[in-house]
A protein has these predicted regions:
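Short glycine-enriched nucleophile-adjacent loop
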Residues: 53, 128-143
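Short beta-strand/loop motif that positions the catalytic acidic residue
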Residues: 181-183, 187-194
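Membrane-embedded segments
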Residues: 26-111, 117, 135
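Alpha/beta-hydrolase fold nucleophile elbow
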Residues: 113-125
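Active-site nucleophile loop of the alpha/beta-hydrolase fold
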Residues: 140, 144-154, 171-175
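Glycine-rich nucleophile elbow surrounding the catalytic serine of serine-hydrolase chemistry
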Residues: 122-133, 196
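An N-terminal hydrophobic leader/cap segment in hydrolases
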Residues: 1-24
Length: 197
């Protein structure tokens, strides 16, 4: 986990002309998650809601391009910082990130009133593993994965082939296994020029 690489905020959706509602979501285990809800647009019904789970380094203020893209496509969006990232409380952990994702889902379906059939779950890099876990336990309209990995042990073994990473890894984020439990349509986006994942 690299939540401390840049916990500072660069900007908000307002800096790119988007209206937003700041969020402070409380997880079942008492952490507070910082986030934003960006409505689809003035007077326009949303085509649905995209819940965005970002990658490892940085925070929600570094993902304004996703908020703009989904807004321009007619979707509302909800983005959170996992525990230990950005302004969220707590300490980063695999299990904690799954609880955080479920907290965002609960807010989307209960407080914002979106039915599951109108929610797209989007995950980038580390967020892809978080999004996959959520989609395996809930039934979103779709799961979109961008530049993600099959599992942390697989990624580690590719980067360090001479080390027994698969045996030593405590953090798993096993998306390959969880994808078999996802019943929603899945779109995987990846670049051949991505030299990290």
């Amino acid at each position: 986990f690299q939540p401390t690489i840049d916990r500072g905020f660069q900007a908000t959706p307002a800096s790119i002309g988007l209206g937003f509602d700041p969020l402070a979501l409380t997880t079942p285990d008492g952490e507070t998650l910082d986030g934003w809800h960006v409505p689809a647009g003035r007077g326009k019904p949303a085509r649905g809601l995209v819940i965005i789970f970002h990658g490892n380094a940085g925070n929600i203020s570094h993902r304004l391009d996703y908020l703009r893209m989904f807004h321009d496509l007619g979707f509302a969006s909800l983005i959170i910082d996992y525990r230990g990232y950005g302004r969220s409380s707590g300490r980063a952990s695999e299990e904690g990130s799954y609880i955080d994702a479920d907290t965002a889902w609960h807010h989307a379906t209960q407080a914002l009133g979106y039915p599951a059939k109108h929610i797209v779950v989007f995950g980038e890099s580390l967020g892809g593993a978080v999004a996959t876990q959520l989609a395996a336990t809930r039934q979103p309209a779709a799961l979109v994965l961008a530049s993600t990995f099959t599992s942390v042990p697989d990624l580690g073994a590719e980067i360090y082939p001479w080390l027994p990473i698969r045996l030593l890894a405590r953090i798993r984020y096993d998306s390959r296994d969880r994808l078999s439990q996802v019943n929603s349509p899945v779109l995987v986006i990846h670049s051949l020029q991505d030299d990290i994942i």
